[in-house]
């Protein structure tokens, strides 16, 4: 029972499962193809050696100890009867005959294997010799061609050198001939100056002509030899280039032969076993991935280089457009300042003309001059305090529609008030015009600070208030007393004398320039007024022209600004394109990596399935 229990599990196991080489056989499924071939070849050699050893032992009538087998297991014997003779004693001859036959069979097998190996080796040797002979013939042919090309190039170089030496000598002869011509010419000129006889002059002239002929021939030979030398030099250069090409062909052939016959493992060693379909497909896809990745990298580099160059160009154009825009804006500002200065100069000239006209009219022209002076001073004060020039806002339409009526009304009211106070009519008109101009200038300065739209309203309110107050003042007793006080004050303070001196000065000025009659004064005043009007019109025209020029420059600046914005958009677009190229590159690599991962997973699954099938097959 104990023996049955001990051998219970092993009793039901077959011989394959308990064989000692079972683990070694299981390891065959994990070997590489080359290792598998090596293992099988070694096992075959060991088997043949073992069989030869057993055959020789049996031929020598020396049976193996304990009937040893190939796997070192005891030999199994068929059951025999107790009285039966031993099987070995009766079959000695048959054993010897079987061993001899096995030895003969092994010898034939080894001879066949050796013969096939020798035939294959001989065949490969013949192929090798033929290929070597072809390569040797090709190298010999290329070497001969290179030698011929070298010899021809050397001969051409020697010929070119000789031709160059001949051309150099011919050039020297030509220079010597030119020197002889110069000497003959000098002798002839000296003879002419000395007044030598005609026969002497004729001989010298003939010698000069002969020297010129020889010099021409020498120059012709020198030119011909120089052309021949140039031609031979070109031929030598062409042959040298051809020789270098032959040398390059020889070098390429030698390198190719060295690479082909120095590492021709396919002709000397058996080919490695082919891969399976899935493995080969995986290898092909791996190469494909490498090629695509390399192509993607090169494409990305080329796009990046292109976009970088385009961005650099657009940035340069943008900088140029920006500089042009700044120049146009600066030019427009300078033009505007220039036209403003011109307008101010013309305005001062008009003011001076108005003052000149005041000497002849004593009324409206002086008032205009005072208004111009007040406006000029007010313009400077306003520009210094607020930075705004109301002279640019209040031009001719304001003068015609507001200033003149306002000034005339204020002057009329003041003149009437002064006449009512007992002042002389002429002096009252002069003072009224001056005071009206001053009041109008003050009102306009205030209007410039308040706003141009309120000029008429402020002026009308000032006029109404002044008229009402003056009327009330003249009707009241205080007004009458004020008139008397003004008369006395004027007498005491010398205002009447001041007015008389002013009138006298104006009269002297009119006489000094030849204006005696009132009509002459009016004529000159009209002329000054016309001149002022013409200058005013010219000022307006120049200001308008300056405004047009400034507008044109600003339009050019706006065009440049549009180009700058367009260039900025192009740079942004190039950046977006470069980003898209990088994203596409990353997406391609991701797809390829995913594909290779799927192929690797499929190959791993196939390998796992094969291993599982082999395990199940061994377990049978």
Curated annotation (Swiss-Prot):
Gene Ontology annotations for the cellular component aspect, listed alphabetically: extracellular region; host cell membrane; membrane
Family, per entry: Belongs to the SctE/SipB/YopB family.
Subcellular location: Secreted; Host membrane
Provenance organism: Burkholderia pseudomallei (strain 1710b)
Biological processes per GO annotation: symbiont-mediated disruption of host phagosome
Name of protein: Translocator protein BipB
Function: Plays a role in the bacterium-induced formation of multinucleated giant cell (MNGC), which is formed after host cell fusion, as well as in the intercellular spreading of bacteria and in the induction of apoptosis in macrophages. May act in concert with other effector proteins to induce fusion of host cell membranes.
One Pfam family linked to the record: T3SSipB
Regions of compositional bias (Basic and acidic residues) in chain numbering: 66-84
InterPro entries linked: BipB-like_C, IpaB/BipB/SctE_N, T3SS_SctE/BipB
Region listing for Disordered, in residue ranges: 58-95
Record's keyword terms, sorted: Coiled coil, Host membrane, Membrane, Secreted, Transmembrane, Transmembrane helix, Virulence
TM segment ranges: 355-375, 401-421, 430-450
Coiled coil region boundaries: 309-339
